[in-house]
Curated annotation (Swiss-Prot):
Keywords: Ribonucleoprotein, Ribosomal protein
GO terms for MF: structural constituent of ribosome
Organism for this UniProt entry: Buchnera aphidicola subsp. Schizaphis graminum (strain Sg)
Cysteines paired by S-S bonds: none
The protein, known as: Small ribosomal subunit protein uS2
Amino acid sequence: MEIVSMRDMLKAGVHFGHQTRYWNPKMKPFIFGSRNKVHIINLEKTLPMFNFALSELKKISLKKGKILFVGTKRAASKKIKETALNCNQFYVNHRWLGGMLTNWKTVRQSIKRLKDLETESQDGTFSKITKKEALIRTRELSKLENSLGGIKNMGGLPDCLFVIDAAHENIAIKEANNLGIPVFAIVDTNSNPDGVDYVIPGNDDAIRSVTLYLQAVSLSICKNQNGNSFSEMLLDSDKKMNIE
């Protein structure tokens, strides 16, 4: 079943790529042409590729698979966290720490430290130590929560990655490739699609486009949707964006 329509994509500006001088020739099969020195993405390619990716994500979700959402740039950060939490999944929405997947043993130790500090902050330990020491631990807790808060309950490596902006998150993609973890990614005209198992050619900069991708994923894999159609969800999102 098609979740996203061509009309939804056009309204969200999914077809707008980057300036032609920044293009990656490997994206040529997905480019319709150019307008005012900006590449136009062929939505007749994007639409079926995205809907297929959504159906594959749904299969992973139904098997209780762990999906790690990755989007550390400003246009994606807030929505990535929102979507992952809404779907009881996991996220990295600030800086990707090198080795987050490939050096999981060390990451697991940092997660343990984060959880220990969380317990200390809640059980009164911070009030029993000096103010200076409490401040140091509070800062450490904040830093760890920022980096690892979205994966602290993942309990092991994810079953797949869903990435906004393949170029920006290339380290995460390389790590997933090394471990054989499937990668779903929004790939703009300036990006290299190599290493992405499920390529979704599209605008990765506009907040409306990013919102469309994530709401479509949410609709595919989350159980707690309120029954609204996809177009109604986008309309609600537009209203919220205008208020903000």
